[in-house]
From Swiss-Prot:
GO terms for cellular component: cytosolic small ribosomal subunit. The lineage of its organism: Archaea, Thermoproteota, Thermoprotei, Sulfolobales, Sulfolobaceae. Part of the 30S ribosomal subunit. This is Small ribosomal subunit protein uS17. It comes from Sulfolobus acidocaldarius (strain ATCC 33909 / DSM 639 / JCM 8929 / NBRC 15157 / NCIMB 11770). Belongs to the universal ribosomal protein uS17 family. Pfam families: Ribosomal_S17 (PF00366). PANTHER family: 40S RIBOSOMAL PROTEIN S11 FAMILY MEMBER, 40S RIBOSOMAL PROTEIN S11-RELATED.
Length: 114
C-alpha cells in the first residue's frame, strides 16, 4: 500500500502529524490498513527491537484509599513501530490502541511527542 504518490491517511488524533516518509508496512496506521481505535496514551520507549516491535513504559499515579496516599506505578505496553517513523529508545511517544497485531501487541506508535 505504500506506493509513491499515495495519499497519507489522517489518523484523527489531535497533536499527531503524519510522517514525511512513506512505507509499505501493512500495520502502519498512515500507509497501511491498520485502524486506530480505543485509547490513546503517552509513554517512554524503553526498548526497540529489529523486527519493528518495542516496549513503552508509562508512569501514572494511583490513590490507595486505605492509607490515603498516592503511589507511583508503571506499566509496560508492547507496541508496533511503523517503518516510516524515526523513533529511538528514550523518546516520548504517543501510542494508540488497534486490533491485535501479534499475541501481545495491540498498540501502535503514532508519533514522537515533542
Amino acid at each position: 500500500m505504500g506506493k509513491k504518490g499515495q495519499l497519507v491517511k489522517n489518523v484523527g488524533i489531535e497533536g499527531v502529524s503524519a510522517p514525511s516518509k512513506t512505507c509499505d508496512d501493512e500495520y502502519c496506521p498512515y500507509h497501511g490498513s491498520l485502524k486506530v481505535r480505543g485509547i490513546v496514551l503517552e509513554g517512554k520507549l524503553i526498548r526497540a527491537r529489529a523486527n519493528r516491535t518495542g516496549t513503552v513504559e508509562r508512569e501514572y499515579i494511583f490513590y490507595d484509599s486505605k492509607y490515603k496516599r498516592y503511589e507511583r506505578r508503571r506499566s509496560r505496553i508492547h507496541v508496533h513501530i511503523p517503518s516510516c517513523l524515526e523513533v529511538k529508545e528514550g523518546d516520548n511517544v504517543i501510542i494508540g490502541e488497534s486490533r491485535p497485531i501479534a499475541k501481545s501487541i495491540s498498540f501502535v506508535i503514532l508519533g514522537v511527542k515533542r
